[in-house]
């Protein structure tokens, strides 16, 4: 229906919605149908490398079905006739990627993309030991945070949360920051 009414697209964009897609095969099948030759799909996603490096476990929550790194995403895309050809690093959400994709061989891979692939390989994000170490750091962070907040409460001071986004709920629930620690939260 979209093709019939509007024709093929030169550019399709999606910022911070990709992690919510529950059927990537169907999504990319339709993107390929909608993109004209030399068309570009641009998505912006929180970057898993930064999540691990900066201990951003609060960005993990029920609505996010995927966390993106370039190596497996590009491998998947190549199997379905697409590729990543460029990438930009963004500061939003603790560090995000704007990823530029096309049908295979429509565009030459940029130096930025190649450098980030090398950085991902060096980071060994697919190594289970790296992920276990991350989990251990998360547990340690929870203990440290609850200790600091408990000490603040013991001194008779208030602990409040300003704003309560989904990410905040992950932190509050995982760290068990309930009414005994938090005086109130406000949006």
In which residue ranges do the predicted regions lie?
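Short amphipathic alpha-helix with an adjacent loop that forms part of the alpha/beta core around
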Residues: 1-8
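A solvent-exposed beta-alpha-beta segment
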Residues: 2, 150-187
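A conserved beta-strand element that flanks and buttresses the S-adenosyl-L-methionine
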Residues: 10-14
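A short glycine-rich, Lys/Arg-flanked "PGG" loop and its adjoining helix->strand segment in the class I
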Residues: 25-42
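Hydrophobic adenine-recognition pocket in adenosine-nucleotide-binding enzymes
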Residues: 17
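Flexible, glycine-/basic-rich loop-and-beta segments that form/coincide
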Residues: 93-141
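Short, glycine-/aromatic-enriched active-site segment of Class I SAM-dependent methyltransferases
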Residues: 43-66, 70-73, 77
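Conserved S-adenosyl-L-methionine
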Residues: 82-93
